[in-house]
Amino acid sequence: MSTSPKKPKTKSAAYKKVDIVNVHLWGKHIGAVALDPTWGFYVFEYTPAFASLGIEPAPMQMPVLPGATYMFTDLPEATFKRLPAMLADTLPDDFGNALIDRYMAQKGLDKASVTALDRLAYMGNRAMGALEYKPTRSPPKQKPSAIVLSDLVTQARKAVEGTLDDDDHARAALRSILDVGTSAGGARAKAVIAWNPSTQEIRAGQLEAQDGFEHWLLKFDGMGSDNELGSRSDDGRIEYAYYLMAKDAGVSMSACRLLEENGRAHFMTQRFDRGPGNTRHHMQTLCAMNHLDYKKKGTNSYEQLFATLDRLALPYEQKEEAYRRMVFNVVGKNCDDHTKNISLRLRQGQRWELAPAYDISFAHNPKGEWTHQHLMSINGRFKDFTRSDLLQLANRFGIGTASAVIDQVVSSIAQWPTFAAQAGVKNDLADDIAGFHLLTLGRWGAGALAASPGRVRWRHTSR
């Protein structure tokens, strides 16, 4: 009996380290970034050709000036990776970085030897927003094919738990999750997908979407527990209920929906950094735009947000929109209101604008490190706000409709049971969340805001 010879295992190609990364925006080479060996930080310079176009991708901290170089030795490394903030902003956070580390390990690089330039090169043209990086060190493109969501959930959970093995099947699983999971920010496991609303088919969405497909972001349900987040089984439904409630309150958001499979409810939101025909929009979080480190607790304020909007000369309507979101976060107890959860958008040929709201959900843990109080202050307070606090901020920044905005938001959040029922949130959980809503902000009760006593359940759903 003859046997076929075993197919030899193929070694992955050796990884080539990156010394300089060229940055592109809308097909134009805008500059390059490299390590300054003296300081140990990364320095960026715009190209002379780009400097003549009048486009400002980072107007507050890196204005486009011929011959100017930018290096920021005062920015905390944990957040900005020794990079200029505009570039660091395009790197993924915990989940995406863990996947990149796993991929690099297969290439023979341990985590300590992977530089910020390596990570930018890995992102290539996969990053959120419109910036692209060359050379590219990411896996080669694959032909778009359908993804089985339940399999992807399993792979994401293994990636979160660090239990992906090194056999051939594990490598294939890693490749699948890499195709969807290394672009989006935030600690929670997310997938960047292309979704066909007619056929319900899902494909990897980091590159161009095919005809009939749209760019969406999916937050995985069923990922287990987290020290800060606690039980995670209802996060998708809660966030969807908050989306319905925010829309009713007049908050501007991209389309959202639930994708249900095998008893799980995954929250989906349409990407606002993509437009028709795979158009890409340039993005900056508030964290990057104004160097407001989102990891610094007890430091940042909503006043800094409105000062940023004023410096960018945004119109009144967008300042009112930002105010509406602030009030919604306070009344709805979304304490995960850090500077990476607010973004500005630049569409090609247009001016900077406030991006749609995102990561709007119930997020409060009285014993949590991050969400026992708000992460941005109002009138010097991080909790126990009064209507007067909100109105004083409004007066300072010329929000003349503030009182009406507050009352509209309170009226919508008072209808929480209706929105929770529409999203399928369990009654007892919906009741617990309602106990934390700060409805005393309404015109009929403008006293100090405090959570209802006796509530012991907590949730934190957006980090």
Regions found by a protein language model. Name each.
Residues 1-339, 343-463:
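Phosphate/dinucleotide-binding and metal-coordinating scaffold of catalytic cores
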